[in-house]
């Protein structure tokens, strides 16, 4: 990501799901390689991400390189 370019943060859409799942798998692999426990990668699939997209709870940060981050916002602790 170009440090001069601020990321664009928006509510994710269904077209973002595959990229979000890939990003989360990459992040989990990176954390695991550093010895940090990560998410249960088996749970992170299209269905998992789609649940948050359908409720408009998944936000993505993107730049010209694509999606560079994501987070969920919800009223309740899942």
From Swiss-Prot:
InterPro entries: Acyl_CoA_acyltransferase
Domain of life, source organism: Bacteria
Entry keyword set: Plasmid, Transposable element
Gene3D superfamilies the record matches: 3.40.630.30
This protein's name: Uncharacterized protein in sul1 3'region
